[in-house]
Amino acid sequence: RGTMVSRVLYRPFDTEDFDAIALILQQLWHNNSDNDEYNRLEAACDLAYCLSSSTFSQVAVIEGQARGIALARAGQSSGATVNEHWMDTERALLSQMRELEPDACAEYLSFVRATIRTNNRLLESSPLPHDNEVTLLAVDRDVHGLGVGSVLLDAAVSHLSSRGATRAHLYTDSNCSWKFYELHGFKRTATHRA
């Protein structure tokens, strides 16, 4: 690809980025239903959930378009850090999902519950503190390989350490790039086979 890479601008998440970021999540992880509108809602719901529990955001913008995001949560995972606006958004999206595709929605919710259970188990079996989490890292497939994910992850980790975290954790599925995380000083402390 001999194209010139445009400048990448990094800044905190803005509500106007929501649709573009949700679309990235949809392309990466939320494409199981034949109903595209449902997939869109599911991705948006996932994003709203991540935003509701995060204390830090960084978005990569290329040519005016949000192409990547990192979210993190520093400090105790108490209700103090929960963002009501995004919780309400998540709830509204869930009810739309339920109306549109009740079965797919039920499946998504049981997947989310299972994931939370698994993540909590993994956390208990690892020596990590329960707070200080990189809650989301997603980069548009079209810009993979440009180092955008590295900058975003480093920004999230820097935020956590500026809040006094000596360790941070993130959850990932098995088809992620382990090498990428290892290069950033992460190592697998626990795994779960679904």
Residue spans for each PLM region:
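A short beta-loop-alpha structural element at the N-terminal edge
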Residues: 7-23, 74-75
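Active-site rim helix/loop that mediates acceptor-substrate recognition in acyltransferases
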Residues: 35-62, 67, 71, 92, ...
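Conserved acyl-donor/pantetheine-binding loop and adjacent beta-alpha core of acyl/acetyltransferases
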Residues: 76-132, 194
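Conserved catalytic-core motifs of GNAT/GCN5-like acyltransferases
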Residues: 77, 169-171, 187-194
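Conserved active-site alpha-helix within GNAT-family acetyltransferase domains
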Residues: 120, 150, 162, 174-191
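Conserved GNAT acetyl-CoA-binding A-motif
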Residues: 131-132, 160-173
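Conserved beta-strand-loop-alpha-helix junction that forms the acyl-donor binding cleft
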Residues: 135-144, 169-179
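Conserved acetyl-CoA-binding loop-helix of GNAT-fold acetyltransferases
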Residues: 139, 145-158, 183
